[in-house]
Amino acid sequence: MSRRNAAVKRPILPDPQFNSRLATMMVARLMQHGKKSTAQRILSDAFGLINERTGGDPLELFETAVKNATPLVEVRARRVGGATYQVPMEVRQERGTAMALRWLVSFSRARNGRSMSQKLAGELMDAANEAGSAVRKREETHKMAEANKAFAHYRY
């Protein structure tokens, strides 16, 4: 690890189409092999489908979905005297959002058939309604942290 100053975090610029930082982060997670325009098209198509099906603002639904999938606590492995403990720790807001977006994208990809924009739209609508795989993953993460509460004093 470098002994110099901490790396400066680059500011995330809002997406030109939706004027949202969260949309920019989602495009980055959707992108494969540097194909940003394809990722942007997938997101805008998904938002179009959401608008068709719900009639509401897709950006609002997207923000709700991310909020519902964001974990508050997680477990991290900590080695103490030859034993490895799963230590529950709070998740910083930035990391929680990144985890939620990663889960939403990976579970969208895992859905059956259809185009990626349809799968993403379905996962986002499910997450906004407190359902779906990403929300279930968050609940599992919280349960793991609750089960390992006894090791909370090993926090670092």
Swiss-Prot record:
Coiled-coil region? none
Quaternary context: Part of the 30S ribosomal subunit. Contacts proteins S9 and S11.
Q: What does the record give as the function of this protein?
A: One of the primary rRNA binding proteins, it binds directly to 16S rRNA where it nucleates assembly of the head domain of the 30S subunit. Is located at the subunit interface close to the decoding center, probably blocks exit of the E-site tRNA.
The record's section on InterPro entries has: Ribosomal_uS7, Ribosomal_uS7_bac/org-type, Ribosomal_uS7_CS, Ribosomal_uS7_dom, Ribosomal_uS7_dom_sf
Keyword rRNA-binding in annotation: yes
Q: GO molecular function of the protein, one example?
A: rRNA binding
Matches recorded under PANTHER family: RIBOSOMAL PROTEIN S7 (PTHR11205)
Q: Which UniProt keywords apply?
A: Ribonucleoprotein, Ribosomal protein, RNA-binding, rRNA-binding, tRNA-binding
Q: Pfam families from the entry?
A: Ribosomal_S7 (PF00177)
**Similarity comment text for this entry:** Belongs to the universal ribosomal protein uS7 family.
The organism sits in which domain of life? Answer: Bacteria
Could you tell me the Gene Ontology terms of the biological process aspect for this record? translation
A cellular-component GO term for this protein: small ribosomal subunit
**In its UniProt entry, what is this protein called?**
Small ribosomal subunit protein uS7
